[in-house]
Amino acid sequence: MITVVAKLQAAEGKQDELRAALEEMVGNVKQHEAGKATMYSLHTSDADPTLFLFYEQYASQDAFDAHGQTEHMKAMGAKLRGLLAGRPEVERYTQIAGV
């Protein structure tokens, strides 16, 4: 199981546009990657509503690799330009225990 945590900060005045784009991304993953992305959850910070966090889990390395190569993810990369205050912070984790 591969886990990814990504933080995205909205550019000034772009919070609503970014949120809409990220919600669209969740819908595309749900529609096109069912069974590969076992968790793809979007959150916003309680302390800073311009800060968004994705919590993602993938069934395998192949599923994770395929996610980045989908047409909807490639299109989203272009859409996010101008909506972010900087580069997303992305960290990858490997699950070692859980219930």
What are these regions (language model features)?
Residues 22, 68, 77:
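Short, flexible helix/strand-to-coil boundary loops that buttress conserved ligand/catalytic motifs
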Residues 2-9, 39-68:
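Short, well-ordered beta-strand segments in beta-rich or mixed alpha/beta enzyme
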Residues 14-38, 72:
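Short amphipathic alpha-helical segments
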Residues 32-34, 61, 70, 87:
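Acidic-histidine catalytic/liganding microenvironments
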Residues 39-50, 76-99:
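Glycine-rich beta-strand-turn "strand-cap" elements at beta-sheet edges
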Residues 16, 62-65, 74:
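Alpha-helical elements of the RecA-like P-loop NTPase motor core of helicases
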